[in-house]
């Protein structure tokens, strides 16, 4: 889903940077408003125009099936 948006090395680095529970910080994860728009379209799985909490919790798994789910604290 992220082909053409991020290189494989960037994906691995991003996942490694937030592997620990409660370590995800969207401010450091997305680099530009354009990137946010691209990711929003990918994360909004049901194309509702909103990112539901469940979609957000599973966001890292969009990169890699083995990635952790975000915690409640990280999605608030």
Swiss-Prot record:
Superkingdom to which the source organism belongs: Eukaryota
Protein name: Parvalbumin beta 3
Upper classification of the organism: Eukaryota, Metazoa, Chordata, Craniata, Vertebrata
InterPro entries assigned: EF-hand-dom_pair, EF_Hand_1_Ca_BS, EF_hand_dom, Parvalbumin
Keyword terms, alphabetized: Acetylation, Allergen, Calcium, Metal-binding, Muscle protein
Domain EF-hand: 31-66
Binding site for Ca(2+): 44, 46, 48, 50, 52, 55
Recorded GO MF terms: calcium ion binding
Leader peptide range in chain numbering: none
General function of this protein: In muscle, parvalbumin is thought to be involved in relaxation after contraction. It binds two calcium ions.
SUPFAM superfamilies for this protein: EF-hand
Entry's Gene Ontology cellular component terms: cytoplasm
Organism in which the protein naturally occurs: Merluccius polylepis (Southern hake)
A Pfam family assignment: EF-hand_1
Further comment: Is regarded as an important allergen. On the 2D-gel the determined pI of this protein is: 3.98, its MW is: 11.33 kDa.
N-acetylalanine: modified positions: 1
């Amino acid at each position: 889903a992220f082909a053409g948006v991020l290189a494989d090395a960037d994906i691995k680095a991003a996942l490694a940077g937030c592997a620990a529970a409660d370590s995800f910080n969207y401010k450091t994860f997305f680099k530009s408003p354009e990137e946010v728009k691209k990711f929003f379209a990918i994360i909004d799985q049901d194309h509702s125009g909103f990112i539901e909490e469940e979609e957000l919790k599973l966001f890292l798994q969009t990169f890699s099936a083995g990635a952790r789910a975000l915690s409640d604290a990280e999605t608030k």
